[in-house]
């Protein structure tokens, strides 16, 4: 991968010739949302065919089969399904995942919805056919398949469900929960989370996570904590075990103690990170005020390290926050 030209190349060791193999795809092969002052990295390689004549490359959504002999044009193995449905299709990690695929290979892949943040576990064959195995408002992790490939141990999580282990057949049918590692959660008030969207001061859609107390009453006023570090919306279905921290505060700890926690995504324009932060964080906070969720005089701001700099910037530009850390 050439990060400056943002293309994939093949190199012929016999002739020393370098040939661009990704321009013909027609979609960017680099991370388009990359907002750091450095060349954007590639989405990556999924694997190779067993004969070594083809490589599978990722774009933002799909798999592309590239013929390294140059005889055939790039082919979208997943037939554009990911882009059409807004889902990123990626190989899942396990003890049996491979980088080299036989013609009859069936690969376990994740389909992650970039809008809802839900995830599905699918089977992808080398003809591009997808078969759904399980799906939901979870993040799934595969731990291990049995040596005979008949059974599997895996887990799932979301904001209220701990990462307990599950056992099932290798196609994830007949699942059985085999651990209950966090029973003490039932003894505490917990919380909920939802993905919210608003228009920021750059006139772009902005996303963020809003954590609410378990017994949230929209008729009452709650103290609100606004905290951020780059992006958070992709963490919608991540379980947070309450803990103390010297960096960002744990959202479920605060929600359990009667706080609203707002974690907006911040996307940066290179060279003006402070203003980018202002456009996202302040617009999102004012959106919550307009919706009657947050209330002036009861809004705190929290940032750490890189977002600590941005917090220092924000308090020189607005008085919307009662206190800042």
Which residue stretches match the model-derived regions?
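Serine-hydrolase catalytic core recognition
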Residues: 141-325
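Beta-strand C-termini and the immediately following turn/loop, strongest in propeller blades
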Residues: 1-4, 12, 47-48, 54-62, ...
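Extended, charged coiled-coil "arm/hinge" scaffolds of SMC/Rad50-like chromosome-maintenance ATPases
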Residues: 123-126, 133-146, 152
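Repeat-solenoid scaffold signature
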Residues: 3-8, 34-76, 307, 313-316
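Surface-exposed loop/turn elements that mediate protein-protein interactions on large endomembrane-trafficking
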Residues: 11, 16-19, 72-77, 121-133, ...
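Beta-rich catalytic cores
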Residues: 42-44, 117, 138-141, 161
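C-terminal/domain-terminus segments
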Residues: 64-92, 126-135, 273-281
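Surface-exposed loop and turn segments in beta-propeller and other repeat-based domains
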Residues: 16-41, 77-99, 180-194
């Amino acid at each position: 991968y050439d990060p400056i030209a943002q293309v994939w190349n093949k190199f012929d060791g016999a002739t020393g010739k370098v040939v661009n193999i990704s321009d013909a795809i027609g979609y960017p092969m680099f991370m388009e949302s990359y907002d750091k002052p450095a060349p954007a990295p590639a989405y990556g390689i999924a694997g190779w065919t067993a004969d070594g004549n083809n490589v599978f490359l990722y774009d933002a959504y799909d798999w592309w089969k590239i013929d390294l002999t140059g005889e055939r044009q790039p082919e979208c193995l997943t037939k554009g399904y990911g882009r059409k449905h807004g889902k990123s299709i990626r190989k899942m990690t396990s003890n049996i995942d491979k980088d080299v695929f036989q013609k009859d290979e069936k690969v376990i892949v994740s389909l992650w919805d970039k809008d809802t943040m839900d995830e599905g576990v699918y089977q992808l064959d080398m003809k591009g056919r997808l078969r759904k195995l399980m799906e939901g408002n979870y993040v799934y992790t595969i731990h291990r398949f049995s040596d005979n490939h008949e059974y599997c141990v895996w887990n799932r999580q979301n904001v209220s469900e701990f990462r307990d282990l599950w056992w099932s057949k290798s196609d994830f049918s007949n699942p059985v929960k085999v651990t209950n590692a966090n029973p003490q959660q039932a003894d505490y008030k917990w919380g909920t989370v939802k993905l919210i969207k608003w228009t920021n001061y750059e006139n772009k859609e902005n996303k963020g996570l809003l954590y609410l107390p378990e017994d949230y009453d929209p008729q009452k006023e709650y103290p609100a904590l606004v905290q951020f570090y780059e992006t958070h919306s992709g963490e919608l279905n991540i379980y947070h075990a309450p803990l103390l921290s010297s960096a960002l505060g744990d959202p479920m700890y605060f929600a359990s103690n009667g706080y609203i926690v707002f974690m907006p995504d911040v996307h940066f324009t290179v060279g003006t990170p402070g203003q980018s932060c202002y456009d996202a964080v302040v617009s999102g906070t004012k959106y919550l005020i307009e919706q009657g969720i947050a209330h002036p005089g009861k809004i705190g701001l929290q940032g750490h390290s890189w977002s600590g700099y941005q917090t220092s910037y924000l308090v020189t530009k607005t008085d919307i926050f009662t206190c800042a850390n």
